[in-house]
Amino acid sequence: MTAGTVVITGGILATVILLCIIAVLCYCRLQYYCCKKSGTEVADEEEEREHDLPTHPRGPTCNACSSQALDGRGSLAPLTSEPCSQPCGVAASHCTTCSPYSSPFYIRTADMVPNGGGGERLSFAPTYYKEGGPPSLKLAAPQSYPVTWPGSGREAFTNPRAISTDV
């Protein structure tokens, strides 16, 4: 490979990686804005739901569960034939069958994750430490043992060329 081919291949690879990152970020933002409801939208939807559809006693539904489309006659009909079996919503537990909350790319808000999104600090101390810190180690005094060779150092190695080599 020539240097130009390597540069072009690296540029294409970097472009593909950046496009993948941008696509994942756009998907996350899309999921965030599609499932987020403001207070006025919730009130308007509740009024419409009272007039049009029966309410579910299980709790609020997510956008994936309550989404509607035009049917052949021009009226709104729910996209799913059966409602969620679990309550949906940002603060409540979510149904995994019809909502994108189970996606690994979904951005969870602070009220959806344990520990409040990291706002509360948790301390950790091992149970074997006492309040004074780690226990002191009691070591025996080192002993010296005489090192003896059965002969001189030259006798232990029979081939002197195997020990040192030219560089």
UniProtKB/Swiss-Prot annotation:
What does the record say about its membrane topology? Single-pass membrane protein
Keywords, A to Z, come to:
Membrane, Transmembrane, Transmembrane helix
Q: Does the keyword Transmembrane apply?
A: yes
GO CC term, one of those recorded: membrane
Pfam families (UniProt xref):
FAM163
InterPro entries, sorted: FAM163, FAM163A
What tissues is it present in?
Answer: Highly expressed in neuroblastoma compared to other tissues, suggesting that it may be used as a marker for metastasis in bone marrow.
- Indicate where this protein resides in the cell: Membrane
Q: Using the UniProt record, give the first listed, main subcellular location.
A: membrane
User: Any stretches that span the bilayer, and where are they?
Assistant: 6-26
Q: What PANTHER family is this protein classified in?
A: PROTEIN FAM163A
**What family does the Swiss-Prot or TrEMBL record give for this protein?**
Belongs to the FAM163 family.
Q: Can you name this protein?
A: Protein FAM163A
Q: Which organism is it from?
A: Homo sapiens
The organism that produces this protein has a lineage beginning with: Eukaryota, Metazoa, Chordata, Craniata, Vertebrata
